[in-house]
Amino acid sequence: MSTKIILVVDDDLTHLKLMRKLLGKLGHIVVTTDSAEEAEHILRYEEHFSLIITDLRMPWLNGLDFCRRMKILKPDLKIYALSGWVYNFGMNELEDAGFDGIYQKPISKANLEEILNADI
């Protein structure tokens, strides 16, 4: 598996640390942020990312709206929803937002590998 540059967006700092550790151990470069607004800034002006893993329920800009905006800005970028609140949203709403995959927290190792191997 090639090294990926992954942006993880979640307002839960404990989850960000966990994802950084898990993905880092798998040999990937991980950038984390606790807000979709900052993530949008990073994507507009900074690095090239292989994929994004984002929470859905965040203050100010939620994961749905963040995904919609990023798919306009970077339509080929893979964006995955990872949330403890997946079932609070309609699947059509999530798919229409443009997510490439939707996963429930806590993510299993198999699902994480599915995300990482999706674009090989």
Task: Label every PLM stretch briefly.
Residues 13-31:
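Two-component/phosphorelay signaling modules centered on CheY-like receiver
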Residues 34-38, 62-66:
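Acidic catalytic/metal-coordinating carboxylates
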Residues 63, 95-100:
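As written
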